[in-house]
């Protein structure tokens, strides 16, 4: 620890810290633009100037390391004059367009100019003007406002792992650009909007829509992947205006994937707002009571063993739990959350979780990806891995044909035999696994989505056992889930498989990706919020609330339960999920024993310990899985996905459709250059 004096007070701080960090620790307010705690230091805005005794000039505190005995002053006349001068230079070419700038009201330059500026203007020459750059359908640019802090460049390089933004020219001619002015090839590009301290980079879908003070803020959870990123839903009246990240150091830090951030406009289109019944081959709008009576009559006419329920990819735990209780009361145990027929082992909870945890990745020194596309399945997790790789703290190897993950990977091949050789210790990489202190394996849908998934998983468990990856001080076995509701469904006992043969009544709770050809003879009830495949195949449609219109628990891939709060009202005549299921039970004269959301959560916490620990990770058991299934000779490969359209909300998002089109155009442009 190093002792130093700041404004007359002595503090201690760890060696290697900067003067800026010491000042913040001492409770001092230091203005800054280029500095960001999660980015490399640039030191080019000069706004954080402080006075250090024995130094002839003010010093940029963000770039100066502390040393023993330093005496620092943060509020002297020299410091004040220096900051006023820096602010004056920053404003020389900055346009006075705050009234039409989307950053107005939440702009660092506005705030700091008011607090630290002179309040007068001595510059009477012409301001420079810069042509706006194209960065895709998500980011709107106004580069004349840019103050060259280079935050966006550093985020692209260090966090996103794409070297597609940089600065050209020098001095007053410097410009930040994407070089070829293409759509940015990143799943987390929207974070550049958040870290831009001025209005140079703004959200294109949100442009000219609202001001910060008009919005209501609601804490929620991103449901478009299984990471459980913490989000803030900003709404006005009953319309969602934008979605921003909330800080959670254990999960998403302060970053957010583009899909979770921008696909909210999908909540406006193709919504189900009234119940429907199929009559003479056509869906006809009916009352809720008629829909419930039709369901009651049909359920009473079907044997319990012929009834099945399938939960979709963005359904809350409470809704699944209510549906499970209803089916059990009817005498059926045929319910699943696995509409994709994934081969998932549920022997113990640790067998289907990301046990290392998202933040735990930063402790690993060797990572093996098997059939996993972390970049598109879990962009925030992938960013953490990439940062560790780029500083040389983590080595990543891969089995399976894969995509560019934005960091260096050593490919071992795509043959099943590689896993077999690792399991018996004859592979050339055996030594590296033995020497690694904290090795980890990430198993993706390229394994559990195979027909022989159980056999491959059994083989991977042998590798885990061989190199002692699951022990008291380290859990290195990880399943990379790609849907928000899977872990929660498995936690409450939903099955991993379902028998479609002989089903006479199928209850689809937001499920749109099942093989509908196997349900041709079944009566289908669809409870959901979008008119997608499930609704089009249904005999009865029950319009439900989306995740933004009801409160619900979601368990992320590492097994952490979190609550998504209700932000806006339901659309039309739609109802919340648990209310619909409760009313069906009422028509059937079945007592579920829970009348409201609070009672559902109390019962969940009593029956499953994990739900008594919201926002926490519980200790989980892991057991070696053995399968006698036969291995196929098919190569291992991560399943191809359309990242921007993976559920009913993102599929109905105009913004996501524009992203798909823009990335296809980018591929065509690249093909023209190389072919």
UniProtKB/Swiss-Prot annotation:
It catalyses: a quinone + NADH + 5 H(+)(in) = a quinol + NAD(+) + 4 H(+)(out). Keywords: 2Fe-2S, 4Fe-4S, Iron, Iron-sulfur, Metal-binding, NAD, Quinone, Translocase. [2Fe-2S] cluster binds at residues 34, 45, 48, 62. One of its GO terms (cellular component) is membrane. Residues 78-117 form the 4Fe-4S His(Cys)3-ligated-type domain. Binds 1 [2Fe-2S] cluster per subunit. Binds 2 [4Fe-4S] clusters per subunit. Residues 215-271 form the 4Fe-4S Mo/W bis-MGD-type domain. [4Fe-4S] cluster 1 binds at residues 94, 98, 101, 107. It holds the Pfam family NADH-G_4Fe-4S_3. [4Fe-4S] cluster 2 binds at residues 146, 149, 152, 196. Its cofactor is [2Fe-2S] cluster; [4Fe-4S] cluster. Gene3D superfamilies: 3.10.20.740, 3.30.200.210, 3.30.70.20, 3.40.50.740. NDH-1 shuttles electrons from NADH, via FMN and iron-sulfur (Fe-S) centers, to quinones in the respiratory chain. Couples the redox reaction to proton translocation (for every two electrons transferred, four hydrogen ions are translocated across the cytoplasmic membrane), and thus conserves the redox energy in a proton gradient. PROSITE patterns: 2FE2S_FER_2, 4FE4S_HC3, 4FE4S_MOW_BIS_MGD, COMPLEX1_75K_1, COMPLEX1_75K_2, COMPLEX1_75K_3. GO terms for molecular function: 2 iron, 2 sulfur cluster binding; 4 iron, 4 sulfur cluster binding; metal ion binding; NADH dehydrogenase (ubiquinone) activity; quinone binding. Residues 1-78 form the 2Fe-2S ferredoxin-type domain. The gene is nuoG. Signal peptide: none annotated. Belongs to the complex I 75 kDa subunit family. Its EC number is 7.1.1.-. GO terms for biological process: ATP synthesis coupled electron transport. NCBIfam families: NuoG (TIGR01973). Transmembrane segments: none annotated. This is NADH-quinone oxidoreductase subunit G.
């Amino acid at each position: 620890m190093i002792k130093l004096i700041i404004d007359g007070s002595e503090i201690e701080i760890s060696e290697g810290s900067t003067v800026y960090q010491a000042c913040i620790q001492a409770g001092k307010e230091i203005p800054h633009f280029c500095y960001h705690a999660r980015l490399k230091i640039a030191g080019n805005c000069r706004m954080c100037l402080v006075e250090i005794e024995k130094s002839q000039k003010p010093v940029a505190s963000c770039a100066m390391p502390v040393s023993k005995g330093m005496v620092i002053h943060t509020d002297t006349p020299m410091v004040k004059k220096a900051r006023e001068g820096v602010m004056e230079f920053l404003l020389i070419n900055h346009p006075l367009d705050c009234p039409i700038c989307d950053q107005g009201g939440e702009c660092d330059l506005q705030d700091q100019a008011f607090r630290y500026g002179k309040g007068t203007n001595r510059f009477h020459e012409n301001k420079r003007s810069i042509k706006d750059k194209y960065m895709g359908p998500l980011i709107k640019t106004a580069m004349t406002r840019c103050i060259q802090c280079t935050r966006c460049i550093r985020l692209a390089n260090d966090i996103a792992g794409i070297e597609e933004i940089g600065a050209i020219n020098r001095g007053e001619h410097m410009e930040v650009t994407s070089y070829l002015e293409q759509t940015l090839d990143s799943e987390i590009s929207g974070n550049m909007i958040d870290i831009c301290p001025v209005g140079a980079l703004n959200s294109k879908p949100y442009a000219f829509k609202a001001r910060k003070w008009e919005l209501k803020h609601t804490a929620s959870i991103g449901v478009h992947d299984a990471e459980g990123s913490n989000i803030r839903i900003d709404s006005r009246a009953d319309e969602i205006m934008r979605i921003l990240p909330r800080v959670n150091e254990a999960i998403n830090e302060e970053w957010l994937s583009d899909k979770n951030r921008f696909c909210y406009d999908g909540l406006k289109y193709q919504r189900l707002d009234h119940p429907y019944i199929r009559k003479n081959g056509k869906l006809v709008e009916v009352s809720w009571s008629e829909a419930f009576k039709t369901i009651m009559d049909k359920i009473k006419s079907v044997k319990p063993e012929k009834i099945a329920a399938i939960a979709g990819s963005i359904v809350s735990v409470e809704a699944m739990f209510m549906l499970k209780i209803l089916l059990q009361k009817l005498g059926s145990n045929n319910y699943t959350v696995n509409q994709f027929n994934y081969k998932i082992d549920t022997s113990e909870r640790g067998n289907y979780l990301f046990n290392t945890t998202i933040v735990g990745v930063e402790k690993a020194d060797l990572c093996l990806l098997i059939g996993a596309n972390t970049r598109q399945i879990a962009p925030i997790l992938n960013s953490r891995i990439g940062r560790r790789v780029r500083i040389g703290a983590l080595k990543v190897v891969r089995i399976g044909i894969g995509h560019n993950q934005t960091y260096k990977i050593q490919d071992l091949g795509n043959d099943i035999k590689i896993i077999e050789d690792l399991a018996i210790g004859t592979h050339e990489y055996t030594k590296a696994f033995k020497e690694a202190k904290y090795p980890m394996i990430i198993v993706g849908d390229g394994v559990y989505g195979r027909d022989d998934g159980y056999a491959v998983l059994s083989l991977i468990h042998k590798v885990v056992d061989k190199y002692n990856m699951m022990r008291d001080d380290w859990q290195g076995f990880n399943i990379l889930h790609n849907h928000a509701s899977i872990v929660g469904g498995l936690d409450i006992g939903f099955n991993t498989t379902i028998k479609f043969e002989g089903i006479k009544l199928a209850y689809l709770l937001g499920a749109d990706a099942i093989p509908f050809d196997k349900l041709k003879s079944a009566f289908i009830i669809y409870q959901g919020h979008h008119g997608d495949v499930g609704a089009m195949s249904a005999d009865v449609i029950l319009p439900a609330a989306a995740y933004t219109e009801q409160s619900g628990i979601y368990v992320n891939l590492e097994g952490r339960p979190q609550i998504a709060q209700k932000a806006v009202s339901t659309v039309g005549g739609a109802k919340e999920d648990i209310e619909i299921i409760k009313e069906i039970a009422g028509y059937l004269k079945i007592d579920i024993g829970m009348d409201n959301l609070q009672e559902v959560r109390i019962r969940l916490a009593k029956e499953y310990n994990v739900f008594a620990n919201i926002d926490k990770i519980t200790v989980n058991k892991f057991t070696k899985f053995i399968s006698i299934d036969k291995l196929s000779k098919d190569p291992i490969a991560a399943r191809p996905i359309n990242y921007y359209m993976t559920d009913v909300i993102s599929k109905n998002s105009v913004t996501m459709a524009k992203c798909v089109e823009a990335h296809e155009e980018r591929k065509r442009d690249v093909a023209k250059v190389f072919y």
